[in-house]
């Protein structure tokens, strides 16, 4: 359940621990699955800020590509 995963990650992120970037990345993925693009991007950005080599960088770029594709389609109708 995506909602439950987000709630669990919210709790985990209240603590300080090594590898916190991975939790932000996972929460970003959960938000992406809900098509909550802004929250997904925010969480990917947090992960990238903590770890520039995080896979969140690729995920961030993918979401931006998706959003840019949809916005272009809006103007071409």
Predicted stretch roles:
Residues 15-16, 49-50:
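Structural marker of alpha-solenoid helical repeat scaffolds
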């Amino acid at each position: 359940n995506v909602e439950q995963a987000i709630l669990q990650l919210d709790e985990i992120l209240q603590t300080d621990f090594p590898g916190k970037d991975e939790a932000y990345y996972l929460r970003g993925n959960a938000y992406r699955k809900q098509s909550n693009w802004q929250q997904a991007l925010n969480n990917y950005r947090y992960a990238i800020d903590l770890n520039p080599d995080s896979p969140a960088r690729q995920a961030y770029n993918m979401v931006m590509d998706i959003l840019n594709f949809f916005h272009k389609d809006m103007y071409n109708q």
